[in-house]
């Protein structure tokens, strides 16, 4: 399962993504001991920001000394710093300071949707000109591999992605969480999380966003100007099959947060064993050999076969007589049944 990402040799493709699951030495070392290959630890800024409480909801930098310690204690693991600045000087300063700490690479956060100030996070990722300016600022402070984390809150990720690469980014990551409002109460008229009776537009994550992440990864992988640019897929991975999607669509790295929050670091066992089993039964020697294999199969809607007709099929062994197939086909399938 070993694979290279940004010229960094990784024992497997699976990293903790930039979030609370990788915010201190103890948490990250535990994950490393369990088999995770690397971490993009919680975004570091040069400005103070207060968290609200509660800040989560479900649906029905020089103070980070542990980065150098991690590299000393786990030399075979990959440690990446996520950074976010308010202006060009901030980005340059953060890049320079984190480079001194001995990390392996930098990830620039152009995609977080729930910022307390304008001009940060996803506001940057939506604007190719800002992406260009800030990537160049980071480059002035570091020669480490640079990963630009792109936002899903755009019609097309391609323009900002091209801007990032042209400005000096070595790799691209997608996606971050998606702007949303969830669970609006009919009693309080507030969505969740409810903070003193109010809510705000926040970031939606979890397995439901995975197909959206697949599309953004494909858009970048299929763009000629981004050919051979390493891709990191993040968004909705819960099991090895989800991870396989990203690999087949061109990713050489996979980042995970929400599934860890739900099930713990132990999900690495399923990710590794499932992917190994897939490679074994398909007689594939290395995970590198499947990267991008699905790209030729994705075509424009106008290129799909219009002659073939599929007819309803039934698995009588699994049928329990609930009648849902009849309802779906009769009420929503042109009365196929």
Regions found by a protein language model. Give the residues of each.
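Catalytic cores of alpha/beta
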Residues: 25-31, 89-100, 154-167, 220-227, ...
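Glycine-rich phosphate-binding active-site loops on the catalytic face of alpha/beta enzymes
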Residues: 41-47, 108-114, 167-181, 236-238, ...
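Glycine/Thr-rich beta-alpha phosphate-binding loop at enzyme active sites
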Residues: 113-130, 160, 167-229, 263
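C-terminal helical cap(s) of enzyme catalytic domains, especially alpha/beta-barrels
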Residues: 49-61, 181-201, 247, 259-284
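Iron-sulfur cluster-binding cysteine motifs and their immediate structural context
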Residues: 246, 324-337
